[in-house]
Amino acid sequence: MFRALITALFCFSGLALAGAGHAERIKDIGSFAGLRANQLTGYGIVVGLAGTGDDSLDYSTLGMKGVASRFGLQLPAGVNPALKNAAAVMITAELPAFAKPGQRLDITISALGKAKSLRGGTLIMAPLMGADGQIYAMAQGNLAVGGLGIDAADGSKLTINVPTAGRIPGGATVERSVDAGFATTPQLRFDLSEGDLTTSQRVAAAINGRLGQPIARSIDATTITIDAPQGAEVRTALMSRIENLEVDTAEAPARVVVNARTGTVVINGAVRIAPVAVTHGKMTVQVDEKPQIIQPQPFSRGQTAVQQSSAINVEQEARPMFEFNPGASLADIVKAVNAIGASPADLVAILEALKQAGAMKAELVVL
């Protein structure tokens, strides 16, 4: 079977299955298991700052002593230099799948201590480690800082953006690659970014139909397993063909997303409204406080007093009732809400009421 599969890979191009729905490339809706990026972190020292460093923090001093010791410089016991021109930093980077020794990585540097700005600084060579504690890259270079911080002698400050974080494009060199192990596993596994049973079935059918072999199986809403021959070269060709196949993805479920704090409402096109009548009133309560001065009668030995006078006015705005016809769509909802001049907060209340009444056939997500 695998011999026929290999022949099919090199004889056919990755064309899409015909379908009436919206077709997307398989590579855009998921990824192969194991082919992921890995996070790297490290600790380092940035030098060359114009008096905006950590000053006398203990861990900054220890870090600088460690850097000096690598060059054979030993500071006398009890000497803790004031490091206004240096700062302790945390370094982060992302190691892509299949990254090879010698390749360059972009890195982000963030101050750990009291440094006011990293502008103009240079990162001294620092190791970057993975979650397993192994060193995968070495970082060094001049920082590019977009922020600016200025302190005046009178205590006033001016800060633009974030001056305590910066980046070094290509600032790390890969020293060790990560073995993904995809060439020796019994099967390839493709994971959908968003689980959907229909899409999972369609992906498996697209692979089997294009390659002419029943090698792909939909395991669940997220996972598709693929029988594949051994060997990195053949598997790479197979994965390339699969990634570029097109499949008709399932229609997204009807969903309304509401952010009550900001008044943001997002309604997708699958939302439908059952027959229902809606009215939404607006009440305004206004309270006016007017203090009144009360003077005592002449020769009464009374005291001047202040009396509060309150006037409460309640206004309720009359708004018409509107009706949704059977199967009302997103356009109908927007048109009706705009007609009554509802605010985002009003729309949130209307949608919640529609859901409670069972008239909105959609999932309501409140952030």
Curated annotation (Swiss-Prot):
Key words, A-Z: Bacterial flagellum, Periplasm, Signal
Record GO terms (molecular function): structural molecule activity
Entry superkingdom: Bacteria
Location(s), subcellular: Periplasm; Bacterial flagellum basal body
GO biological process terms on file: bacterial-type flagellum-dependent cell motility
Pfam families recorded: FlgI
GO-annotated cellular components: bacterial-type flagellum basal body, distal rod, P ring; outer membrane-bounded periplasmic space
Chief location category: periplasm
Signal peptide residues on this chain, from the entry's feature table: 1-18
Family: Belongs to the FlgI family.
Subunit structure: The basal body constitutes a major portion of the flagellar organelle and consists of four rings (L,P,S, and M) mounted on a central rod.
NCBIfam families assigned to the protein according to its UniProt record, in alphabetical order: PRK05303.1
Function: Assembles around the rod to form the L-ring and probably protects the motor/basal body from shearing forces during rotation.
Full protein name: Flagellar P-ring protein
Species per Swiss-Prot/TrEMBL record: Rhizorhabdus wittichii (strain DSM 6014 / CCUG 31198 / JCM 15750 / NBRC 105917 / EY 4224 / RW1) (Sphingomonas wittichii)
Taxonomic lineage of the native organism: Bacteria, Pseudomonadati, Pseudomonadota, Alphaproteobacteria, Sphingomonadales
